[in-house]
Every structure is written in C-alpha cells, then in structure tokens.
Amino acid sequence: MSAHQLPACVIDNGTGYTKLGYAGNTEPQFIIPSAIAVKDKVASSNSQAMRWNNRVGAGIDDLDFFIGDEALSPAATNYTVKYPIRHGIVEDWDLMERYWEQCIFKYLRAEPEDHFFLLTEPPLNTPENREYTAEIMFESFNVPGLYIAVQAVLALTASWNSREANERSLTGLVIDSGDGVTHCIPVADGYVIGSCIKHIPIAGRDITYFIQSLLRDREHTIPAEQSYEVAKMIKEKFCYVCPDVMKEFVKYDTDAAKWLRTYDGINSITKKPFNVDVGYERFLGPEIFFHPEFCNPEFTTPISDTIDTLIQQCPIDVRRGLYENIVLSGGSTMFKDFARKLQRDVKRLSDGRLQMSETLSGGRLKPKPIDVQVISHKMQRYAVWFGGSMLASTSEFYQVSHTKAEYMERGPSICRYNPVFGALT
C-alpha cells in the first residue's frame, strides 16, 4: 500500500512527555514520559578476557533499553534513566534515535517505510538540529517523507476547532507551557517572529517542586522517595488559579473545612496508607506564574507583564491581532481560571498604557480600545499534537513534506526550511 494511503505518524516530543499517534485522530494514542533507561556500563578491567567480553556485549547492550513508563519503573534496576530532551531541545541524539525506535516499532507498531512523519520542533530550534532529525529519519528509519512543524503554529491551528470559520487566524500569541519550559511565541500569518520570542523559566516541573517545598516546610509525613510524585498528583488534582492571593488566604483562614482537601496515598515501601492535608498549596502552586518571586527570587516578572512587553516589541501592524488571539497550549495552562486571570491582567496593562497616552496628550488623543482575548479550548492539553494531526490529515501535507528522493538528491539541508501550508495562510 502506498504511503499516501496510510495515515501519517505524528510525534510531539516534549521535555516531560512525548505524544504520539496517527493523523486524523483527536487525541494521541500514546502519552509516555520522555525518558530512556540504558544499561549501566560494566566497570573497566585490565583482564583481556573481560575487555573482549565487554566488546562482544556492547552490541547487545545497545539494544537493551527501556523508554517511557518502563524506564521509570522500579523494576528497571541496573539501568540509568536519562532524558534526551532538556528545555524542549534535544541534547543527546544517540539516545533520541533509540527513543524514536521504540516509539515507532513498539508503540505505534508501524513500518516507518510505509508512513509519512510529522515531527514538532520548539521555537528557536537550530537548523543543525533539523538536519540531525532528517538524517535519523531518512537514513535510520528510511521514511518516505518528513515534515518538521513549529509547535506554536500547530497550537494556533488546534484552537480553530472551537471557533467559527471567520474567526480562524494564523496570527496570534501562543503561550506554550509544558513540564520543562514555557515559551511566549508571536506568530504572524503562520510565521514565527523569532526576534520577539520570550522564554519564561517557570513550567509544570517548577510548580511541582514549589508544592513539594511547601509540604516539606509543614513537615508532612510524606515518604521522602514519594514526595515529588505526591506533589505532582496534588498539583494535577487540586490546584487552581485564584483572582486575589490575599483574599484567598482569608477564605482558607475563615472556613478551612470548606476549602481544605485530603490526598490519600500508600507508602511504596511499607505499604501503609498515609494522607496529606492540602490547603494553601492549592492556589499558591499555579500562582508562581503571576508572582514568580514566590519560588525564584532571580526572576520576578509576571507572565502578564512578559506578554505585554513582548507584544509591544512586535511590528505595530500585528499587535492588535496578537492581543486578540492569545492561545493557551500545554498541560501547565490547564489550571482552572488560568485564562480568566491572564486575560484580566493583560487587559489591565494595555488599558493603563492607553490611558497614559491620552493623559500625556492632554486629551487630544483618543486611542481605540484594545480587545484582549485569551483562548482556552478543550484540545489545550494536547494542542500541539492535535494541530499536527489536523494538518497531517490534509492532502497538502504530502505536497509540502520533504521526500526521501529529495533527501538523497540534496542532503539533510532540505529540512532547514519547512514551508507553511498554503491552505492555512
């Protein structure tokens, strides 16, 4: 069967998790940790026989590894867990190739020669990294076609699912916050404005660490080896964004029984149950997006200020379009009322600037009000993957993808540039 007749494989590699599945589906078939467990190296020996055995076993050890949940399981003893992706960028290409190998053959159960592939890349990814990706995909896996899509553009596309046709736009500001990194990426007509991208050193993992430290300060009887996982479960199960921190403290102090929650767990070693009272952690965790000084004294700029400053640095003719289409993407933007508070704070900043302009002009200038819209939608958690699934299911995907024949003729440099879909612009 032709590769054009089979659905394309869509793989979104993130710092914490990898989403993979087939084009045309609304959700990824698999969501697995971006971790790989490799065999510990045997200690070196001066014995000639030992050196010979090590050389013979090296090839076998290369095949002896686990990825995803299996890599993190307690059963993976004598293995070292590594993360090939850091802050969204691939750092170890040998491990990444082995990771993709199991993604394709073990999870997707696909023959790579029979499917086109859509992979995602973070903002400001280097052209050299695209070339490395092309070399692995075309030479190691012999794929017939490859398209490397910018995550921000895919997230914008995913937001179309909840909007009318006349409201769909490829101009907008994407707030992509996953487990390891948060990026604010302005996009104009499908092209990323690279010089204006902002990086925020706060993401899901930082929230988990902050909640973990809050629980530790209260000297909770949480098993030390489970403290991180417990904090992570509390974050996902109980946390929300509050409109005013001080008023929220008063609410909890006035009627604690109404707002406190209890997390029940089991000690992984003694198998005895334990419970954790969850109070201020519910709203203080996500609040570090708006008050980063709570956990990081070196970074004190709220996310709303970062967004407003970023938009003001963009070309003047796209600024209103960016304010009107702030799209949320990634699991760390899923907290209840996150979109509402972000929209309120950004609106307050933009209105304050317009009012200052009018005041400084002595009332002669009457600026047109700016409409600030923060878009939250049901595909938000897997927005990047879902956007890739939408695009890879169109006929144009096969026209813009780089083929194996082009790669053999021109080399990996063809993947330095991946055209924007004409149907989207």
Swiss-Prot record:
Gene3D superfamilies: 3.30.420.40, Actin, Chain A, domain 4 (3.90.640.10)
Keyword entries, A-Z: Actin-binding, ATP-binding, Cytoplasm, Cytoskeleton, Nucleotide-binding
Function: Functions as ATP-binding component of the Arp2/3 complex which is involved in regulation of actin polymerization and together with an activating nucleation-promoting factor (NPF) mediates the formation of branched actin networks. Seems to contact the pointed end of the daughter actin filament. Plays a role in time-dependent memory loss and the retention of conditioned behavior over time.
Disruption phenotype: RNAi-mediated knockdown suppresses the memory retention defects of the msi-1 os1 loss of function mutant.
Similarity section: Belongs to the actin family. ARP3 subfamily.
UniProt-annotated location(s): Cytoplasm, Cytoskeleton
Subunit-level organization: Component of the Arp2/3 complex, at least composed of arx-1, arx-2, arx-4 and arx-6.
InterPro entries tied to this protein: Actin, Actin/actin-like_CS, ATPase_NBD
Entry's Gene Ontology molecular function annotations: actin binding; ATP binding
Superkingdom to which the source organism belongs: Eukaryota
PROSITE patterns named among the record's database cross-references: ACTINS_ACT_LIKE
Keyword Mitochondrion: no
Cellular component per GO, a single term: cytoplasm
GO biological process terms, semicolon-separated: Arp2/3 complex-mediated actin nucleation; epithelial cell migration; gastrulation; morphogenesis of embryonic epithelium
Location, primary (coarse class): cytoplasm
Annotated SMART domains: ACTIN
Protein's UniProt name: Actin-related protein 3
